[in-house]
Amino acid sequence: MAITDWPEGERPRERLLAHGPAALSDAELLAIYLRVGVRGKSAVDLARDLLHRFDGRLGTLAEASLEELASVSGIGMAKAAQLKASFELTRRALSQEMATRDSFTSPGKVRDWLRLKLASRGHEVFMALWLDAQNQLLKAEELFTGTLTQTSVYPREVVKAALAHNAAAVILAHNHPSGIAEPSRADEMLTRSLKEALAMVDVKVLDHFIVAGNTPPLSFAERGLL
């Protein structure tokens, strides 16, 4: 059944107009963007198929290639291009917010950006957000990549990068592809080692985030682990 044949109160667009976007499911929001379905499937059905293909995770969907998106029945290259453009605009909007001087007074913005960057990665990635003395972003840099379960991080190389960017502070982050955001003993020990090494060159570690799946990134600072 086409969405136009649904009761008005159940149609995604009408629900958004009445209750706002936060009231809609991921599939309903995608359906509004897709606009129309295909023979035998409404736009909501098509959106559900799309989410199912990418494990129900918007982060994984956002990282999919054009070819991967277009391979879903009913999507095609035109809709795939529209989706990629939408995800890229979201990334750019967050990046622009990150470049403003008050970016790092809002942990929520940092979390959102890190989730976009790291949540769907299939292997561990360790990155640093280098900041100046006013906590304005100098550079977001992926320093090390590893396997599904671990990555090797070398404090000496992190210190070299800090000096190269003339950084005054840093926010560290890495992902757990397992989907579990809890820090391991190795994570805690590494954080202490990096904090001590960077302190030797007057670079302050403001936080260390672990990004895992759709859960909010875990903050070492909030856990009292810094």
Curated annotation (Swiss-Prot):
User: Which intervals hold domain MPN?
Assistant: 103-226
Q: Which domain of life is it from?
A: Bacteria
Q: Is the keyword Zinc in the record?
A: yes
Q: Which InterPro entries match?
A: MPN, RadC_JAB, RuvA_2-like, UPF0758, UPF0758_CS, UPF0758_N
* Short name of any one Pfam family annotated for the protein: RadC
Respond yes or no to whether keyword Zinc-finger is given for this record: no
What GO molecular function annotation could you give as one example from this UniProt entry?
Answer: metallopeptidase activity
Q: Which PROSITE patterns match?
A: MPN, UPF0758
Cite the entry's keywords alphabetically: Hydrolase, Metal-binding, Metalloprotease, Protease, Zinc
Q: Where is this motif: JAMM motif?
A: 174-187
Binding residues for Zn(2+), per the UniProt record?
A: 174, 176, 187
Annotated GO biological process: proteolysis
Q: What PANTHER family has UniProt attached to this entry?
A: DNA REPAIR PROTEIN RADC, UPF0758 PROTEIN YEES-RELATED
Task: Give the family this protein belongs to, as stated in its UniProt record.
Answer: Belongs to the UPF0758 family.
Q: What is this protein called?
A: UPF0758 protein Daro_3142
**The species this protein was found in:** Dechloromonas aromatica (strain RCB)
